[in-house]
Amino acid sequence: MELLCHEVDPVRRAVRDRNLLRDDRVLQNLLTIEERYLPQCSYFKCVQKDIQPYMRRMVATWMLEVCEEQKCEEEVFPLAMNYLDRFLAGVPTPKSHLQLLGAVCMFLASKLKETSPLTAEKLCIYTDNSIKPQELLEWELVVLGKLKWNLAAVTPHDFIEHILRKLPQQREKLSLIRKHAQTFIALCATDFKFAMYPPSMIATGSVGAAICGLQQDEEVSSLTCDALTELLAKITNTDVDCLKACQEQIEAVLLNSLQQYRQDQRDGSKSEDELDQASTPTDVRDIDL
């Protein structure tokens, strides 16, 4: 007799409020306040002496993997990276505390966006218990103080629905465009070059890159890529040339990510072949632990 219950309760979500999406004042208010929540400087040059850009990329990749494995809301990861960048822009931080800071930022973002937020204990497990729950809770107060409790930051996800509503797209294609745009937004959050970009530009560039990419495989828009870029720039009051440059950078980040993934796959296959040929290492000192 099987007593284990395999039923999974579906996530209950509120319907999108059409009154908010149809009111242009909401979009204008987002555009007005978005820059309040950007990092104040490129902190690698003037604030951080111990942390390098590649370290941020590593902790960002780890944070993204945690959010994906825990099936967090799409907004959690970009919001956590916003907290991390704003903190690092004002507080010199030793590299030994970077993962702790990343865990705290996920902890705060999930509290704001999740119905069942990540727990301190679970986040500590993801650090291989290199930090303790009490340490995470103490740093939570430190980060909150440095951010002045301004946690409701505007992120690219806040613009997605407003942008999609104004595009002449087939309704059945919107979910696919939305999914691709969300992927681009997550990729942008892992790359520091986008940290100083307004969220509206990242959102607009991500939607444009998603539609133009899908356009190569199937008809998802009646507009050409150039006409689409001009329309997107008009929606968010963005300079067309700046938007084109942003979209090209997003596409370059995607290409680099795909190439890295393929390289990792090849390296993995090569390692498996080598293990098959020699089941024991020829020199124990060559093993990097």
From Swiss-Prot:
GO cellular component, one term: cyclin-dependent protein kinase holoenzyme complex
Protein keywords: Cell cycle, Cell division, Cyclin, Cytoplasm, Disease variant, Membrane, Nucleus, Phosphoprotein, Ubl conjugation
Positions bearing Phosphoserine: 271
Alphabetical GO biological process terms: adult locomotory behavior; cell division; cellular response to X-ray; G1/S transition of mitotic cell cycle; long-term memory; negative regulation of apoptotic process; positive regulation of cell population proliferation; positive regulation of G1/S transition of mitotic cell cycle
Localisation per UniProt entry: Nucleus; Cytoplasm; Nucleus membrane
Function per UniProt: Regulatory component of the cyclin D2-CDK4 (DC) complex that phosphorylates and inhibits members of the retinoblastoma (RB) protein family including RB1 and regulates the cell-cycle during G(1)/S transition. Phosphorylation of RB1 allows dissociation of the transcription factor E2F from the RB/E2F complex and the subsequent transcription of E2F target genes which are responsible for the progression through the G(1) phase. Hypophosphorylates RB1 in early G(1) phase. Cyclin D-CDK4 complexes are major integrators of various mitogenenic and antimitogenic signals.
Protein name: G1/S-specific cyclin-D2
Gene from which the chain derives: CCND2
